[in-house]
Amino acid sequence: MVDISIVIVNYKSWNDLKDCLQSIITINSSKFTLETIVVDNQSNDGRLEEFKTLFPSILFLENSGNNGFANGCNLGASNAKGNYLFFLNPDTIINKDAVLKLWKTTYKNPDYGIVSCLQTDESNNKYTEIRFFPKLSTLFGLSRVLYRFLNYFSLRKKFNFHKEKVFPDWVTGATIFMSREWFNTVNGWTEKYWLYFEDVDLCKKTQEKNGKICLIRTANIFHKHGGATRINIKTKALTKTEVLISKHVFVSEHKSGFNKHLIQSLLILSLLFEKCLLAITGIVFFFIPKLKVNIYIFKNLINYYRNAISKKTWISPRSVKYLQK
């Protein structure tokens, strides 16, 4: 039996993936055994066979389509042999120390459903640690600022920089370490999300089963954010639209009654208003790519809401669970 199975979902991120895999194969430890599984979400660019030759010790699986991050993670986990699962982005570079600390922390604390660590980018900036589950007080920009202000002292105490471990509501899916037992307890990743918020959902399900979400500050990995989702303007608009769609899916999954309908309604109104203004700005300043992308986001959002009304579902048409009973 393997101790740790690393699962990576890839979509045309071959250059980043190569660096990631090279960092993995250099890890040699007598304290744990590793296997690595790469699920390619049908990149269809001829690189998969090349990588199979470059990295013969790694298991490469080709998915049936670009089925999303959650579906790819579940496919990788279903082929994994490890007692522990380490879900990793292809645009990360890891080290033995981080893997060992993640494994030890998870092993010694069976009530920790999910464990993650610090992440730094190319400029050595740390990714945020303070993350909240979406609710009325945290889902919108202004309400989130007010929430942080009103809870300043409690948040400062909870995330005190002297602490080696902190417990946010959720951690990013770029680095998620969990036992096989916990993965099975929460029934894996929810495939209703095509991209984004599946990590928020996984952490929410874990907390609902009384599992803790832990971030250890004594370990660190490099994470080049947005490696697979910022290829061009239309791709960037697509992925940013999916963030908004996934917010609706999360609310649909985890809220109920009047509260659910209220949040969904407010979310629709706020997003349409914001994206309409940004789209107008993008039309006026069409020569600025960062602004022009907002035109495509607004179009995508209108099409999504039309489809959501006609099909009576919040799920993205790109999800493998779209229109499934």
Walk through the language-model features, giving the residues of each.
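Short, well-formed alpha-helical segments that are part of the catalytic scaffolds
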Residues: S13-T26
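A conserved acidic beta->alpha catalytic loop
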Residues: S23, D40-L48, G65
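Glycine-rich, basic loop-to-helix element that forms the pyrophosphate-binding segment
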Residues: E62-A80
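Short aromatic/hydrophobic "clamp" motif used to bind/position activated sugar donors
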Residues: L85
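Conserved donor NDP-sugar-binding/catalytic core segment of glycosyltransferases
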Residues: K96-I130
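Short, flexible, basic/aromatic active-site loop/helix in glycosyltransferases
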Residues: K135-P168
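A short, conserved alpha-helix in the catalytic core of glycosyltransferases
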Residues: K163, D169-N220
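Active-site-adjacent helix/loop segment of glycosyltransferases
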Residues: E208, K212-P289, V293
